Amino acid sequence: MLDALTETTASGRRLDDRRQFEHHWMMNPATRAILDDAVDAAMAARGGVPLDLVLDVGCGAQSNVVFPGARRVIGTDLDLEGLKNNLTVDAAIAADIVATDLPTECVDAIACIYVLEHVPHPDRVFGKFARALRPGGVLIIAVPNVAAPKARVTRLTPLSFHRFVYRRLLSRKGDDEGMPFATVLDGSIRPDRLENLAEVCGLIVLRRTDFEDNKQLALRRKFKLTGLPWNAIRAAFRGMSRGRMDPELSDIVMVLQRPFQDPATGTLAESLAAAQG
């Protein structure tokens, strides 16, 4: 259970603007804007209801999503050293989200940014998140589109190749500059399957944004895959996939919510109460 885990650090502070502690060197303005829009959509769906408890899954040294006005933020990751440096959370807990049971209806918001592609059975983890959300709770996830060429190449190549790309082609110097982790890229996180899973779990998809990952964009520019050549490649992929695949849209951000009240259940309960009265 989440409350039984050992807290490794705790800030013991209230942060009016947690964003002031951002130092994520890879957070380019385009991705930052997409995540900010996701937060705005999540908060708008809550209609002004404040956030009591937020869970940031896989946050490491810095939270990529900051919910305004949250009373308490718990960050969790396997990276203990990274957690110790995270200044955007109130409590940092070293834990494996795959092996951890989350209490039912225990949090108001969950952020899971680029985590599900690294774990086995991400659909089960998604189900944990859905059960852990209180009524009105929101979930923001970011994952690669596993059907896109970038993810397919990643899945078919070893981690050593990924590290080579990061070091030699993207000029990353070490782990403090965002080196890659082993990936699973399970098919259950394909965008359409995530949307179906959300429906099964009783969540509403508030917003979905498909966009190009900054690493893919950097590599395209390095190898001059821009302009007409890139447009031709995109057209070819769209044609072969009958419009279902655009190689430029390599990643997605999705915003989901558990309804404040299930309309069908609420109507039945009210009807039964009225009949008894």
Give, region by region, the residue ranges found by the protein language model.
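Conserved aromatic
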Residues: 51, 119, 188-189
